[in-house]
Amino acid sequence: MHFRTPESLLTPAMRDVLSRMARANRPPFHTLTPGQARAAYESGSNVLELPRQVLARVVDFGIPVRDGHVVAARLYAPSTQKLPVLLYFHGGGFTIGSIDTHDGLCRQLSHLAACAVVSVDYRLAPEHQFPVAAHDAWDTLRWLAGHAEELGLDAHQLAVGGDSAGGTLAAMCALLARDTGLPLALQLLFYPGCASHQDMASHRRFAKGFVLDEAD
């Protein structure tokens, strides 16, 4: 594929998003403390301007994991029928993001796919270092597989998904599910990190001006 500039690959809507982010002129996340970065991400989470879809069910609950912690979760469903369910992990580099920052996205996924979505607040670094997030992700998937019926969901149509770091967790869960015989219907992965290196041609091509900038 040949193109003149990386910007030429963007849709007008995405160019507008990047323009608004540039005008906001906020400090890079890596210059902030974890608390400051999370607050900044939270305040800017409506940058995509997704409409807040009204759904038949939006329920907050908790999922217990191996060390006794209870992971906060939110169920979205467009109807009260027995629906397929997507377990969704938010993005944020394993350090920022939450159920609330991805509320609009999960509402849209539930509405457009006509399925239930369960979004989870896995624990974040640096307070909770590896493998805590990975354990939280896998434990919530196993719990949902065993308790979907109690939530009025179809345990036989279970999927995992996520964006960025959440996509990484979803891919990991899919591999563990394969190896342990836990059946999944599909993976829904939005730009997951699935390699240990960051030196591909696309990293260099989009190093500046595309949300995640290469450090100087």
Predicted feature residues:
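Hydrolase active-site cap/lid region
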Residues: 175-216
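Short beta-strand immediately N-terminal to the catalytic nucleophile in serine-hydrolase-like folds
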Residues: 160-162, 190
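Short beta-strand element of the alpha/beta-hydrolase
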Residues: 83-92
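Gly/Ser-rich "nucleophile elbow"/oxyanion-hole loop immediately N-terminal to the catalytic nucleophile
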Residues: 145-160
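Short beta-to-alpha linker loops that shape the active-site pocket of alpha/beta-hydrolase fold enzymes
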Residues: 121-125, 193
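Short amphipathic alpha-helix adjacent to the substrate-entry channel of hydrolases
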Residues: 100-120
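A glycine/proline-hinged amphipathic helix-loop "lid/cap" segment
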Residues: 1-71, 75
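Gly/Ala-rich beta-loop-alpha elbow adjacent to hydrolase catalytic centers
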Residues: 162, 166, 170
